[in-house]
Amino acid sequence: MITIVLLILAYLLGSIPSGLWIGQVFFQINLREHGSGNTGTTNTFRILGKKAGMATFVIDFFKGTLATLLPIIFHLQGVSPLIFGLLAVIGHTFPIFAGFKGGKAVATSAGVIFGFAPIFCLYLAIIFFGALYLGSMISLSSVTASIAAVIGVLLFPLFGFILSNYDSLFIAIILALASLIIIRHKDNIARIKNKTENLVPWGLNLTHQDPKK
């Protein structure tokens, strides 16, 4: 019974639409009607500012981490923490508190990985910010980090680097999360190909573009 309750709790944690609620409560703004229309960290930064964007990222990240740690906190045996983390990502992507229309799962997925394999998460953060510095595109950085996650989870155990051994469930979860993130960024990928993607004012390309509808 406790397992079912915690699994539901993991989904509900993921379902917290932090950007949407921050916009509505503190700014009287519906993020879905502004910028890209997304309720995640990037659009929150653009529309509501740095403080709101950072708050959104922190909440989205740590709701993934907390969900992953639930079975450890409650000394639950028999179910991998990754299953709880995956449910949080599903909740973030299809939140019951926001009409099942959620974000692109980047921050929450990172939080899940941090809760299970923090050094691997650090590796992905380096890849993410390296790609962001080179391309000035959050979407490109997210997709690049997703691909790097797949490469890392498959190759690192061969050399005992960062990951000491193969974990079939961790590999499956990484493949699932990477696929989800890439699919959720399909429109961004099209804009990258067309050279019309939104840029952030940081890195080698400091050009700023208005968010596209």
Curated annotation (Swiss-Prot):
Q: Which SMART domains match?
A: G3P_acyltransf
Hey, which family's this protein in? Answer: Belongs to the PlsY family.
Pathway listed? Lipid metabolism; phospholipid metabolism
Q: What is this protein called?
A: Glycerol-3-phosphate acyltransferase
Annotated GO CC locations: plasma membrane
Q: What is the effect of changing residue 36 to A?
A: Loss of acyltransferase activity
Description of how the protein assembles with itself and partners? Probably interacts with PlsX.
Q: Which GO terms describe its biological process?
A: phospholipid biosynthetic process
Side of membrane Extracellular, spans: 1-3, 75-80, 162
